[in-house]
Amino acid sequence: MKPVNIFFIGRKQGVGLRRFRLSHLENRRPAELEGLRRASSSIHQVRLIRNADVVWVRVRPEFTTDPERRRIEQRLRPFRDQIPIINDIAVFNNYDCKDTTFSIWKEHGISCPDFISFDTFQYTYNHSDTVEQILKFLQKYGKILLRTNNETAANGMYLLNSNATGKEIDAIVDDLENRCRMFFPTRSGTRIIAVEFIGSQDAGGYIDLYRAHILLGQIISYYAVTSKQDIFHNVDMKEQCLERFIQLNEGLCDKVQSLNDQILQASTALECNLGAVEFFLLDNKPIFIEFNPMWGGHASMIGFGNTKVQNYLDTHKKALKERIPNIYAWLNYPDYYKALFEQINKSIQPIVH
């Protein structure tokens, strides 16, 4: 199969004085460069965008400013109708602003949490009305997340239970207002949102979070993590969660296949063609909560769970590899990214040749 040429562009690559350098891969994950080198018979990185068969926009949304977006947009505009673009900067708000994401999903009949959002005028000039709306929303659902709409890693996020008072909410809104004012000059889409909390449906109190990775209309990988914490990250998964973690991933292949169309629709509705979509399962039906165009968290760098979980998965690899192949395929980072770049070739080939 003929190799395709790829051009990378981001905040620090493919624009300005950095537009011609090949020695850098923005937001690279461990072993991603090695994977790109291993896939050299399928894909070549090029220095000039006009020589590309495909362009990959690589930005970390939470650090990307409006001026940086405009620079990338200006660079892409002359080529947009000529070259396929992976995650065009034109759809940045679709995944960066959680309220925009939820709105689009709801418009397409895709299940996601309920939410309300407040623009700058509302919470600056109608502070008391904002607090009142949040109180009513909390009364409706009993537990909610109050947060900024475009931060990650639980930054700018509060979990409110039904016993939260108006005074407590008022103080949180004050803090979030200050965060919005700090970000607004360079990230004008920043807003306050209240989001329905999707809690545990498990008798043991576990919350199971599923993630599927999508590339150009294909699900290329997936996994599930679990915890008893209301808000948790991969690193929070402890050894007590191991049995459930293994069970969840053991049956995940068939489950993902049955949800294939719904998972892909969550991506295409946002006009994104690469990224990680996160969801819960309630009565075996997905509730989508987030789309991340550049996954690069704990699982992508170190592995699953805390050190004890990682050690267990490593020492029991021989016994577990047949049961949870998706986990070990993911952890083999060089081969994983080699396969990712080869898949770009397979997907782009019919378009360019």
Model-assigned labels for residue ranges:
Residues 155, 161-254, 258:
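Phosphate-binding site of ATP-dependent enzymes
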Residues 70-72, 99-100, 206-209, 274-275:
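Short, surface-exposed coil-to-beta transition loops
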Residues 135-146:
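Acidic/histidine-enriched active-site and ligand-binding environments that engage anionic O-linkages
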Residues 277-279:
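Hydrophobic residue at the +6 position relative to the catalytic HRD Asp in the kinase catalytic loop
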